[in-house]
Amino acid sequence: TARSRVENEGESLLTISIPAFCKDFEKSLDLGKLAPGAFAGWKPAAAGYPRFLEGFLCKVFDSEGFLLNDASMDAIRSIRQLCLFAKKLLRPCSDERVTMASKAFIDCDDSLVPSDGQTYRYFKQLAAILCEELCLRGEEFTAHLKPRHGPGATREHISGNQKWNFVRWHTRLDDVGFTYFKYGRGTSSPITLSDLVRADYLNASPPVPVLPGDEEPVRVVFVPKTLKTPRVIAVEPVLMQYAQQALSSYLQKHLETCFYSAGHVNFTDQTINQVLALEGSRSGRLATLDMSEASDRVSLTQVEDMFESVPFFRDWVLACRSTRAELPTGDIITLKKFASMGSALCFPVESMVFYLTIIASRMSRAGVFPTKSSLYSFSRDVYVYGDDLIVPADEAAAISDDLESVGFKVNRH
């Protein structure tokens, strides 16, 4: 059946249609019965489930659509294997889908508006408590910054050691103290007089100062994720990426060791969330939230509010944030989002935003005011790895509602 349908319908059956079929199948397994509205577009059999893969489905669900007590694990594995083996087949998306993705990128950015609900007010209060513990106040953190170049692509198509040859330096970075003469060689110690008389410094031209309006935008590219939806990557200018790495490393280190977030906000070990997701699937105590357009829905306003209590650190974060993006169409837009994937600060900042928003949701619904002790107690059942979020299962629906109330989008399935 599958072979004949591929011959008639093409590759999209394997890469788009059947993976969607599997999503409905997994939802039905979770409910213990055929999910309402599931398998739309698939011709039904007499028992109510689709005729497609009917031979397997009859070993999982009874004639009334309920999960069998002795459902065949082999049948379940076979359905998932067949439905998902080509879900992430490495193929370029069609021009039509890339055009749709460009429009979705703009629409998502335009939809970001400030929130003023109680969850968001609690979010800001909790952020002030956490930022104090993260040692972000004052200028002390600047002595510990270690800028570096990442392995990824850059806006200027520069790679390898050529990244160290800075030809442009943004005045926004100079204004906060991230100057070429202090950080241009990858340490927080300034370039000395003896350095300046060395041949490599004498022969090198200093970077050209770049005013904010002349900064290059990030280059938005769409890379294969699924054939239905490509992944958005924002390729940063080499200087911005260099500065972002300094703050990113500092923030990640302190979030992973902070009293309130250690073991709950992770960057170096994803297995914590993987083990907890498996445990939650077995026990039903924990649930995983699946975010859509996660990083693209973290707004600049949210990040500014999160770091409001640490204005000096906030200014540094904003100074190394690209403010505009160039789409594959050549259009350039001013960004309302904080950053897309590709910014070195995207991952730690979005992790912090999601972590605090979830805790704020739990406390708001419990009628508990934000304090140091309540931040600690309400964070114990929350685990974040980027946009991989694990929360108490009995609160998952309410937390999802509150995440959406502040502008995020949760895939409900």
What kind of feature is each model-predicted range?
Residues 1-221:
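Non-catalytic, polymerase-adjacent accessory regions of viral genome-replication enzymes
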Residues 190-413:
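Core nucleotidyl-transferase/polymerase catalytic module
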